[in-house]
A protein has these predicted regions:
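Glycine-biased, small-residue-rich flexible motifs in mid-sequence functional cores and linkers
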Residues: 3-191
Length: 191
């Protein structure tokens, strides 16, 4: 559910010209990058390891596709393996490069909440997708919304409307939905 929501939101934003910035980790991060790529949009992956290391290993195809139509960036030198503490540290770069941070999935203690709190400290906007009140993976999102720290969104248009005054040309297009069958497939998936 969460990965599909992330992919749909990224797809809709990229169809209107936004750039998706995420961390290329398994789960929601990868889904966000996939949505951007499927929309034919730009995406930037901020890595918690050196550029020469693929983490997680199953994302090799995703790294290649992001590099072809976006960017892979890292503050870590080549040869630096992914370490658990790298990810919360790199999240400041993700939020710092972004106009807004969108939280789709967040347990009470998570990297997504670290990114959201960093974004707030940096004066950036934060949005969150609400979830079932008894779902552990929605507790962080629901708390951000309840505390007034994040705007409630249900799709990409909720985000785009917030920036209509700044980017009116981005809002003029028709509302787009993630199609059931998508034109984009990772090279590895095509084989």
């Amino acid at each position: 559910m969460y990965k599909r929501q992330a992919e749909k939101i990224a797809y809709g934003l990229c169809k209107q010209g936004a750039v998706v910035i995420s961390g290329a980790a398994a789960g929601v991060d990868s889904a966000s990058h996939r949505g951007a790529l499927r929309a034919g949009g730009k995406t930037i992956a901020v890595l918690g390891n050196g550029l020469d290391i693929v983490y997680p290993a199953e994302n090799e195809w995703l790294y290649r596709d992001i590099a072809a139509s976006g960017a892979l960036i890292s503050e870590y030198p080549p040869g630096t393996a992914a370490e658990a503490w790298h990810f919360p540290v790199r999240n400041r770069i993700i939020s710092g490069l972004s106009l807004a941070t969108i939280v789709v999935e967040a347990p009470e203690k998570s990297g997504a909440l670290i990114t959201a709190n960093t974004a707030l400290e940096q004066g950036r906007d934060v949005f969150a997708v609400p979830g079932p009140i008894d779902a552990p993976l929605s507790r962080g999102c629901n708390r951000l919304i309840a505390d007034g720290a994040a705007g409630l969104i249900t799709d990409s248009w909720d985000v785009l409307r917030e920036y209509e005054a700044i980017y009116p040309h981005k809002i003029l297009g028709e509302r787009v939905e993630l199609p059931r069958t998508l034109g984009y497939q990772a090279r590895e998936e095509q084989a």
